Swiss-Prot record:
HAMAP family recorded: ATP_synth_b_bprime
Lineage: Bacteria, Pseudomonadati, Pseudomonadota, Alphaproteobacteria, Hyphomicrobiales
Chain segments annotated as transmembrane: 41-61
Name of this chain's protein: ATP synthase subunit b 2
Pfam families linked to this entry: ATP-synt_B
Length: 188
């Protein structure tokens, strides 16, 4: 057999469809059938009328209400933002004024402290200089006393040492009286 069962069944279904299409071939597609134009137009007007009233009475008021609420919210937000901006500007102005005052106070305190330190330093320097001058004068006085004592003692030391030095260097013995007369003559 050249034709299979599946092909035969398919061609049977195809044949039925073709016959059915031929039956309805003389008919017009209902929306394009002008014999029913009045009823189609009637239902079109009713449908669009219903949609118009539904949109006009339900949708548009809701949208309008939403837009109005949003506009009011935006206006209140803008007013609030302006108020907050003014408050912030006021706070910034107060902050800058207080900062300037604090800077001036800090500068005044620094100047005052600097002047006090300079005065204290001057006083301490004068006290130290006075103390050092006094100590220097005392030291010079002590040096003068020591020098005078040393000068006075030089004569007695010379009287003791010179006879021995002369004896060792020259080998001659010198009397203490002649050394004493020579030292006294050198002092005058």
């Amino acid at each position: 057999m050249l034709v299979s069962n599946v092909y035969a069944q398919t061609s049977e279904a195809l044949r039925e469809r073709v016959e059915n299409a031929l039956e309805h071939a003389d008919r017009v597609f209902p929306p394009f059938d002008f014999s029913h134009f009045c009823s189609h137009f009637f239902w079109l007007v009713i449908s669009f009328g219903f949609f118009y009233f539904f949109i006009a009475r339900v949708i548009v008021p809701r949208i309008g209400c939403t837009i109005e609420i949003r506009r009011d919210r935006i206006a209140s937000d803008l007013d609030r933002a302006m108020r907050l901006k003014q408050e912030a500007d006021t706070v910034v102005e107060i902050y800058e004024r207080k900062l300037a005052e604090a800077r001036l106070q800090a500068y005044a305190i620094a100047q005052k402290t600097s002047n006090e330190i300079k005065e204290k330093t001057k006083l301490e320097r004068k006290e130290i200089e006075t103390s050092l001058d006094k100590k220097l004068a005392d030291a010079e006085g002590q040096i003068a006393k020591i020098r005078n004592k040393a000068v006075q003692n030089i004569g007695s030391i010379a009287e003791e040492v010179v006879p021995e030095i002369v004896k060792k260097l020259i080998g001659v013995e010198v009397s203490k009286e002649s050394v004493s007369l020579a030292v006294k003559a050198a002092d005058n």
